[in-house]
């Protein structure tokens, strides 16, 4: 099906382009969302009349998105979740969770603006891309941790997936422990004799 794009769509085209897409993609997504029109003579004439208005509206949305992007780009958000000793979460962090955290910080971000291929299931730092506008994309850091103090340590670059790192255990290697035990045993034998 041939359609006229009403806004820039990644991997498809710019506003005003006439492109050919699969019928289902046009009928189920592009046309209902108001992102495209069927490419017939009547719609082509209508689009040419409305082109200036559409461009002005697009520029306005883009400038609003850029203002938000300046404030939000590169920010870090902490997500506290329960997890096992290996760092595996009891549950996951999805686009809904990320949207709620960013919204609670005072920014209006919808779930559909977050590009996350699959839910986050382990603790760590994740770079997430947000599409505020088809032409404005930014990145934020999501810090998934078991506690706020752990998130701070993680942000400083510490790896927190081993038991030693989680509980701040400072164990000596097994060989050193074995030598100390042998020295202690030898001393106790000498004392008994």
From Swiss-Prot:
Gene: rplI
Pfam families assigned: Ribosomal_L9_C, Ribosomal_L9_N
Source organism: Bartonella quintana (strain Toulouse)
Secretion signal, residue range per the UniProt entry: none
Family membership noted in the UniProt record: Belongs to the bacterial ribosomal protein bL9 family.
Name of protein: Large ribosomal subunit protein bL9
Keyword Iron: no
Primary role: Binds to the 23S rRNA.
Region annotation (Disordered) ranges: 155-193
SUPFAM superfamilies for this protein: L9 N-domain-like, Ribosomal protein L9 C-domain
GO BP field: translation
Gene Ontology molecular functions: rRNA binding; structural constituent of ribosome
């Amino acid at each position: 099906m041939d359609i006229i794009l009403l806004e820039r769509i990644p991997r498809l085209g710019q506003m005003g382009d006439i492109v050919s897409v699969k019928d289902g993609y046009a009928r189920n997504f592009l046309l209902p969302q108001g992102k495209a029109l069927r490419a017939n003579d009547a719609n082509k004439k209508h689009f040419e009349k409305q082109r200036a208005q559409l461009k002005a509206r697009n520029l306005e949305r883009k400038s609003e998105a850029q203002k938000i992007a300046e404030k939000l780009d590169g920010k870090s958000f902490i997500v506290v979740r329960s997890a096992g000793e290996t760092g595996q979460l009891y549950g996951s962090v999805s686009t809904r969770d990320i949207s709620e955290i960013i919204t609670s910080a005072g920014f209006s971000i919808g779930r559909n603006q977050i590009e996350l291929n699959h839910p986050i299931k382990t603790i760590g730092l994740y770079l997430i891309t947000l599409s505020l506008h088809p032409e404005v994309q930014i990145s934020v850091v999501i810090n998934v941790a078991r506690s706020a103090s752990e998130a701070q340590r993680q942000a400083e670059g510490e790896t927190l997936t081993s038991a030693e790192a989680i509980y701040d255990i400072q164990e000596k290697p097994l060989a050193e422990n074995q030598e100390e035990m042998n020295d202690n045993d030898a001393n106790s034998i000498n004392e008994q004799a």
